[in-house]
Amino acid sequence: MSKLTIVRGFNDVLPLDSYKWQFLESKVKLILDRYNYSETRLPIVERSELFHRSVGESSDIVSKETYDFQDRNGDSLTLRPEGTAGCVRMVIENNLATRGQTQKLWYCGPMFRYERPQKGRYRQFYQLGVEAYGFDGIAIDLEVIAIAWSLFKELGISEYVTLELNSLGSSLNRQEYTQALLQYLKPYHAELDEDSIKRLDKNPLRILDSKIEKTQKILANAPKLIDFIDHDLRLRFKQTCQYLDALGVRYKLNENLVRGLDYYTGLVFEWTTDKLGSQSAICAGGRYDGLVDNLGGQKTAAIGFAIGMERLLLLLEDLGKLPNQDNACDVFFILDSAQLHQSLAIVENIRQELPQLKIDMDLKFGSFKSQFKKADKSGAKVAIIIGQDELDNGFAGIKFLQQNEEQQQVAFNELINFLER
């Protein structure tokens, strides 16, 4: 029989690593509570049509990377490759953005893309999503950027990340620019890399995002998207930059930043780092003001961003910003297996009365000698002994494991007071 192993591109979070996730998730919740965003929990499976209509048929994600399948009813379903589309579907289906309502939401969970696995890029990956609906003005643009900035400051990594900004303008602006870009690239068709040639027919703007040096040299003299953007949108983008200056948020303009999802409009941004090699983007987002009505809802202003949690953890680890793991328990009980009905009741009462304590014991209940060895290995500060003699006398034995002191005795009815000290 063949050995069962994990699916390629998927990862187990082992017990020794789970504290890293708990640390990061606690910081995420701290920041989002500060900005009064509400958590939502979304299904990992959606109808395939949702992503075709939102992310885009021609996008790399939909055309090459989604996990698609049919259920027993013949419905075409997809493991979610990103979270925004599902969040918009939820908002529409539950009438959360009608009649001028506003929503500030966040979620965190696994996403799935069939990509070549490498460090920081996996086929199942966890993503934090932050989404806001019903806000038209610049203030919400600044707030979502400030949320990411605040998280990076809370984690102690703000000096190692860079905010990159661009504006994609309106859909009409992009159509006009796309025609100008195609016209410019015509003479260079044979010199473009293979992926860029494919994008000429499907999604020409994505050529701007090419990492191939030769293609980037060709693009150096290409028309600039900013020159095709309406005056009002250009002014809004300029004002956004001015406000970021006032807030003290460092940024740089990136004219080639276009994002890989078709639903973005207006402002787009990424937070990047030079500490993770080719997987430099750790946060990306922007406005998607047309997506809600494209999916059947009322026209609703919308903006959001996503953070790759694994990449963020890799960065924290690389920079030494993760706390040391503390698996040590506070109290280790050493019990007589012949008297468990009494001693376990005492232990459980203490757990209920002092829930902040980490309490452990040897559930195999070997000899006292073997239990003391396990107590020493547990890292506990104190061992509490409850054997037949202790039960007969009404006193628990107390041994401070990290100090060279004689064993003490404490009456059972004083144990809670003793442990609270």
UniProtKB/Swiss-Prot annotation:
Keyword Endoplasmic reticulum carried by entry: no
Pfam families the UniProt entry points to: HGTP_anticodon, tRNA-synt_His
Entry's EC annotation: 6.1.1.21
Catalytic activity: tRNA(His) + L-histidine + ATP = L-histidyl-tRNA(His) + AMP + diphosphate + H(+)
Cell compartment(s), UniProt: Cytoplasm
Family named by the database record: Belongs to the class-II aminoacyl-tRNA synthetase family.
Quaternary structure and interacting proteins, as annotated: Homodimer.
Protein's name in the database: Histidine--tRNA ligase
Gene coding for it: hisS
